[in-house]
């Protein structure tokens, strides 16, 4: 089934996968934002010596981290569906634009997995720090992971910006 325009076609499978992928991406952004807020709250609990609340929040964040990973995996499946439909998109300019957009989003998902893994490591280190402080070596690991998380966030934001520009170009082409 195709959505037809004069000299233009976009497979319904592509459009459906794009919509599902968009919803997943929004959920990932929301969950990741919540994790950043929790990190601030954990730091506050640390300053207040409230280890039980910090540990509780860290446990919740480790579960949220798994949820983000699962959502990113589902997003990659939607990107695969979109990629399979690309050869059937007309005109060629739209096909080329969306191929670039999908490639950018695949790169973004790859960075997202790395970002999420750094977060997981950070929460695990903080869990050790609060539950077994005698095993906690130093704050260098925390500082390193926060720096890596920030690097990945910058890369993800840049890829997202490029993706949005490219997908907007695709939309302009097919909606002319």
Residues covered by each model-derived region:
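C-terminal amphipathic alpha-helix
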Residues: 3-79, 105-176
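Acidic/His metal-coordination segments adjacent to aromatic residues that form catalytic metal sites
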Residues: 94-105
């Amino acid at each position: 089934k195709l959505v037809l325009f004069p000299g233009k076609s976009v497979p319904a499978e592509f459009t459906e996968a794009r919509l599902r992928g968009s919803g997943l991406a929004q959920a990932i952004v929301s969950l990741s934002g919540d994790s950043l807020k929790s990190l601030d709250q954990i730091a506050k609990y640390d300053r207040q010596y409230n280890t039980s609340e910090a540990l509780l929040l860290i446990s919740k964040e480790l579960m949220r981290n798994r949820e983000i990973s699962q959502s990113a995996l589902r997003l990659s499946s939607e990107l695969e569906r979109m990629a399979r439909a690309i050869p059937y998109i007309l005109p060629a300019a739209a096909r080329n634009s969306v191929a670039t957009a999908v490639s950018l989003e695949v790169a973004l998902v790859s960075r997202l997995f790395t970002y999420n893994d750094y977060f997981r490591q950070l929460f695990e280190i903080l869990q050790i720090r609060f539950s077994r402080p005698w095993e906690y070596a130093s704050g260098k690991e925390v500082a390193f992971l926060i720096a890596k998380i920030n690097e990945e966030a910058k890369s993800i934001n840049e890829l997202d910006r490029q993706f949005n520009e490219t997908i907007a170009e695709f939309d302009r082409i097919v909606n002319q």
